[in-house]
């Protein structure tokens, strides 16, 4: 089954061209199926690019998915027009009465700030608490993952001496995990962050388990043993050119930045990078969506009573 998104969303045509099955609202109504309700809390400045990245992965599932785009109410986006936000987004205040089968919280370029100094931290805490009663399963990504694991488990973040930046080998630590079904023993994942969480702090919580890790970059994916929260600290959703875009953005702005590790062919920025993580990104999100489908209540309004 395809993903249901507005026909006029910029990602629509791109997804069609890529072979992702997308569905208009008219066609969705004709199918007698309850679509999985997936919310995307998009905290990134370039919301359109992030919409496409996440819709691409969620939409690859054989299940019908309805994606709702959500933003922080009082926060003004720097790189996305107000017209786009008004046309396609709802604020969390506008959707907090709803129940969601799945909910994605993205990263945000604010990781060097203490959590309490983030202007929308109080609302973020409300949203995280709300997910416990209104969301069946949550996928937290990069800063969203760090914020969530700090909020729920007190796991701190640490500033790195230099940006973790590139494509790194990671190990599958639990092949029997439902979320890692079909994963290789080791694989590559894009990394782009200024902070990290550490294994020792994760291990202090009996309810957390590390599923993916890199000998160079540390913890990558964590899940809750008795819950339905995933914490992805890196960027499996990235496009082939995402790291390149970040690199040249900083170079052109005169910001000191090292070339992304293990990314450009022959370490030559003039050569187009190859995507070596796409299949595992689809596996992770596909496994997540499938697990939601297997465990979520048939009546979406019963979410929160099933824990």
Swiss-Prot record:
It is an enzyme of class 2 (transferase). GO terms for molecular function: homoserine O-acetyltransferase activity; homoserine O-succinyltransferase activity. This is Homoserine O-acetyltransferase. Substrate binds at residues 163, 192, 249. It catalyses: L-homoserine + acetyl-CoA = O-acetyl-L-homoserine + CoA. One of its GO terms (cellular component) is cytoplasm. The gene is metAA. SUPFAM superfamilies: Class I glutamine amidotransferase-like. Its main location: cytoplasm. Gene3D superfamilies: 3.40.50.880. Belongs to the MetA family. The record marks 111 as: Important for acyl-CoA specificity. Pathway: Amino-acid biosynthesis; L-methionine biosynthesis via de novo pathway; O-acetyl-L-homoserine from L-homoserine: step 1/1. The record marks 192 as: Important for substrate specificity. Transfers an acetyl group from acetyl-CoA to L-homoserine, forming acetyl-L-homoserine. It is found in: Cytoplasm. One of its GO terms (biological process) is L-methionine biosynthetic process from homoserine via O-succinyl-L-homoserine and cystathionine. The keyword Cell cycle does not apply. Keywords: Acyltransferase, Amino-acid biosynthesis, Cytoplasm, Methionine biosynthesis, Transferase. InterPro entries: Class_I_gatase-like, HST_MetA, MetA_family. Its EC number is 2.3.1.31. The keyword Cytoplasm applies. The active site is at residues 142, 235, 237. Pfam families: HTS (PF04204).
């Amino acid at each position: 089954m395809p993903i249901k998104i507005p026909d006029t969303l910029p990602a629509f045509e791109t997804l069609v061209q890529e072979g992702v099955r997308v569905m208009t609202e008219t066609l969705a109504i004709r199918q007698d199926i309850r679509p999985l309700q997936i919310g995307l809390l998009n905290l990134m400045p370039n919301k359109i690019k992030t919409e496409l990245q996440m819709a691409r992965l969620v939409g690859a599932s054989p299940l019908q998915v309805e994606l709702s785009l959500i933003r922080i109410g009082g926060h003004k986006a720097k790189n996305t027009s107000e017209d786009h936000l008004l046309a396609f987004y709802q604020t969390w205040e506008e959707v907090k009465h709803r129940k969601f089968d799945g909910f994605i919280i993205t990263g945000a370029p604010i990781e060097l700030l203490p959590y309490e100094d983030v202007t929308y931290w109080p609302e973020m805490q409300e949203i995280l608490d709300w997910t416990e009663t209104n969301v069946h399963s949550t996928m937290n990504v990069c800063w969203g993952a760090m914020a969530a694991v700090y909020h729920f488990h007190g796991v701190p973040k640490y500033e790195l001496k230099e940006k973790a930046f590139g494509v790194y080998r990671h190990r599958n630590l639990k092949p029997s995990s439902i979320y890692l079904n079909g994963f290789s023993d080791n694989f590559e994942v894009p990394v782009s962050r200024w902070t990290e969480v550490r294994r020792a702090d994760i291990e202090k919580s009996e309810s957390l388990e590390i599923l993916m890790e890199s000998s160079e970059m540390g913890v990558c994916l964590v899940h809750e043993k008795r819950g339905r929260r995933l914490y992805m600290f890196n960027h499996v959703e990235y496009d082939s050119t995402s790291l390149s875009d970040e690199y040249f953005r900083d170079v052109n702005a005169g910001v000191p930045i090292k070339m992304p590790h293990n990314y450009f062919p022959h370490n030559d920025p003039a050569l187009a990078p190859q995507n070596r993580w796409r299949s595992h990104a689809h596996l992770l999100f596909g496994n997540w969506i499938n697990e939601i489908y297997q465990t979520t209540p048939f009546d979406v309004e019963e979410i929160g009573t099933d824990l």
